[in-house]
């Protein structure tokens, strides 16, 4: 019997997600043994600066893809929001799992919601997307960068000078912590989620037919379709650098995809937001990108990138 080696980052969340995928594959009747290989990524090692300054989200994927290319591992489980919008040649996205809660979650020391936080309160996030949207709603707040895994960020909220932090609800849910600690879930209308947020992406070698066949059993068609619209938009807009960009798609009762997309400046002073519907996910993502570019969003992203590079 073939043994499938699954590469995972070493954080508790990454391992929990990987174990969940193994359980789903076994439930679906996968005729293989499974083993987890822990991999340290560059993104896990550099914790003192924002992701955008050190190469963006691909930092969490590069070492794992290298291990796959070397055949040290067969598949990798990623949080979909960390997967670059275009995969390297030779790799394939074998499955997109059913999306769980896509929202951002606010956790505050005093139990204040976003609307209730006193002026001057310090909100911790590692995301320019969240920063742009939070400051657009509450320009009287201060955003400070916070890095590290969930446990580290929760500790920093208690020990350092943060009044609140914002994390992805999905990670908290997977760890079984959301009910205890979340002050407020931010509705997607208020804070548009990251592309792919709440879904897992399972990557494998493009020529591994046996694994590709196995992964089909846990692919969720609705999530795959909506995430494809989001990822197409992301690719057309900027292709992977970590910038203030958001995209969230749902399937309507009529079977259409509704895509909400947003581009902004990190200080929240300029926000471009659009909601469009369509049948074809790729076409919808491309149409959305063009709509925001026509409003001037591309120039804003270029300015943001230049600003980040000069810091």
Curated annotation (Swiss-Prot):
Keyword Endoplasmic reticulum: no
Protein name in UniProt: Porphobilinogen deaminase
Family of the protein in this entry: Belongs to the HMBS family.
More details: The porphobilinogen subunits are added to the dipyrromethane group.
Bridged cysteine pairs (disulfide): none
EC class of the enzyme, as a word: transferase
InterPro entries to which the protein is assigned, alphabetical: HemC, Porphobilin_deaminase_cofac_BS, Porphobilin_deaminase_N, Porphobilinogen_deaminase_C, Porphobilinogen_deaminase_C_sf
Signal peptide: none
Listed cofactors: dipyrromethane
Cofactor note: Binds 1 dipyrromethane group covalently.
Keywords: Porphyrin biosynthesis, Transferase
A Gene Ontology term for the protein's cellular component: cytoplasm
Single GO MF annotation: hydroxymethylbilane synthase activity
Enzyme Commission number, as recorded: 2.5.1.61
Residue list for modification S-(dipyrrolylmethanemethyl)cysteine: 241
Keyword Transferase in annotation: yes
Pathway(s) served: Porphyrin-containing compound metabolism; protoporphyrin-IX biosynthesis; coproporphyrinogen-III from 5-aminolevulinate: step 2/4
Gene name, Swiss-Prot/TrEMBL: hemC
One GO BP: protoporphyrinogen IX biosynthetic process
Taxonomic superkingdom: Bacteria
Function: Tetrapolymerization of the monopyrrole PBG into the hydroxymethylbilane pre-uroporphyrinogen in several discrete steps.
Subunit structure: Monomer.
């Amino acid at each position: 019997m073939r043994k499938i080696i699954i590469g995972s980052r070493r954080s508790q969340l990454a391992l929990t997600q990987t174990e969940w995928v193994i359980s789903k594959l076994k439930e679906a009747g996968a005729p293989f043994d499974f083993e987890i290989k822990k991999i340290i990524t560059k993104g896990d090692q550099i914790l003192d600066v924002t992701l955008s300054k050190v190469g963006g989200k691909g930092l969490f994927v590069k070492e794992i893809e290298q291990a796959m290319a070397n055949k040290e591992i067969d598949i990798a489980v990623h949080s979909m929001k960390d997967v670059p919008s275009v995969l390297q040649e030779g790799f394939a996205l074998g499955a997109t799992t059913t999306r769980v809660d896509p929202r951002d979650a606010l956790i505050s020391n005093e139990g204040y919601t976003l609307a209730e936080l006193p002026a001057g309160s310090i909100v911790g996030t590692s995301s320019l997307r969240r920063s742009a949207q939070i400051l657009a709603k509450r320009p009287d707040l201060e955003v400070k960068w916070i890095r590290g895994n969930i446990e580290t960020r929760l500790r920093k909220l208690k020990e350092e000078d943060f009044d609140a932090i914002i994390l992805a609800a999905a990670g908290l849910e997977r760890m079984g912590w959301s009910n205890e600690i979340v002050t407020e879930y931010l509705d997607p209308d208020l804070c548009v989620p990251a592309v792919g947020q709440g879904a897992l992406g399972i990557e494998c070698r493009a020529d591994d037919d046996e694994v590709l066949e196995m992964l089909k059993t846990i692919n969720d068609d609705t999530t795959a379709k909506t995430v494809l619209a989001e990822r197409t938009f992301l690719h057309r807009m900027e292709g992977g650098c970590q910038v203030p960009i958001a995209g969230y798609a749902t399937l309507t009762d009529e079977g259409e995809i509704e895509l909400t997309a947003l581009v902004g400046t990190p200080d929240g002073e300029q926000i471009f937001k659009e909601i469009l519907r369509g049948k074809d996910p790729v076409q919808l993502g491309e149409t959305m990108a063009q709509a925001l570019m026509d409003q001037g969003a591309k120039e804003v992203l270029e300015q943001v990138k230049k600003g980040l590079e000069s810091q």
